[in-house]
């Protein structure tokens, strides 16, 4: 709810480590969800607050292992660098995915698709597991 998210942002702004969970399929979707909780007249201010205080977004999914022995973690990692912070501030959330792809080596970011490809090529998941991950993105597996 609005009051809880606002309180979390204020606490994070003062330098306190703050964790939250959201049911979203990507880092960009998580950021949008936080911003969209607020009335439109406050969203610009919230984008600024979020761009300054956000330290990371981890999106995760547990997928069936190829060997049938449990599950394996697929994850998207967003680490806000100056470019990401600027995209949040300027309400260009739709460009975050591309910035994450470009920031993989230098900043340690990883898109969900990159994680899926890694798991697949290491033999940890099958094509079927890739397509079960989330239905919103174009997956990289054959």
Pin down the residues of each PLM region.
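Short, flexible helix-loop junctions that flank or precede catalytic/ligand sites
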Residues: 1-142
